[in-house]
């Protein structure tokens, strides 16, 4: 796996986690 792809995946996971937690806290 290319480092750039792995870094992109990590960023996407972090972003998704933040977005999910934010949306969940609003419920």
UniProtKB/Swiss-Prot annotation:
Any coiled-coil regions, as ranges: none
Domain of life: Eukaryota
Tissue specificity field: Photoreceptors.
Cellular component aspect of the GO annotation: mitochondrial outer membrane; pore complex
GO molecular function per UniProt: porin activity
Family in the record: Belongs to the eukaryotic mitochondrial porin family.
Protein name in the entry: Voltage-dependent anion-selective channel protein
Species for this entry: Doryteuthis pealeii
């Amino acid at each position: 796996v290319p480092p750039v792809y792995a870094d992109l995946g990590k960023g996407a996971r972090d972003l998704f986690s933040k977005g999910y937690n934010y949306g969940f806290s609003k419920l």
